[in-house]
Amino acid sequence: MKVAGFDWDDGNWPKCGKHGVSRAEIEQVLLGEPVVMADPHPGEPRMRAIGRTEAGRYVFLVFMFRTINSQIRLRPISARYMHQKEIDHYEQQKQVHALAAQ
């Protein structure tokens, strides 16, 4: 799937930014190598992502794919810095994936 960019507006940015995570950090995580899984939200198909920023901060994100003018864009729904338990899970998943790739 080719993603053309991000879908930011006055609806999603305030919700993402209220926990102190910047747009740049959110984009770094989603463009990096996050662990991505389905989100159980009942109303619309959403995804969860956990990953690290270039500065090494761990971020938890909820996002969805939006088609705008025939282009697929990532629309962040919410973002926050991860708790230690989530960081431990993320690092464990990275190790499992690294071993599987060998």
Q: What does each of the following model-derived ranges do?
A:
Residues 1-102:
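Ribonuclease/tRNase effector modules and their secretory precursors
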